[in-house]
Amino acid sequence: NAISYEIMLKDEGRPAAGRRDGYFSIYRQGGTTTDEGERIDYRVKMYNPETGGQIDVRNNENMVWNSINLKRVRPVVLPGIRYAVMCVPTPLTLAVDKFSVMDKQAGYYMGKLSVIFTPSLPTIN
């Protein structure tokens, strides 16, 4: 079991002038800019296993959780692993603030949200 967990969520990292601090973005396919008219900004909330409440996640910022392996742990079967792995459920909620569709270019919007999870492991002397 890990002593602590470092978690970071980030989007593609493209520049996004006018985007609220901490928000994430998806972009219009075939778009030539990252202007507000060719992207849709969103925010992410995450279940905090330390408190049991929801927290706002900020784009590209590390969060460190300690001793969560002592709370709400349950076995989960993951693809490619023959045995159940002990996990703490941490659902994500993605939310888009209201906007006028007239302010956006027509087309398909897509993006990538990466979740980087780094457990620290105890050392054996």
Regions found by a protein language model. Name each.
Residues 36-105, 120-125:
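Extended, well-structured beta-strand/loop surface patches
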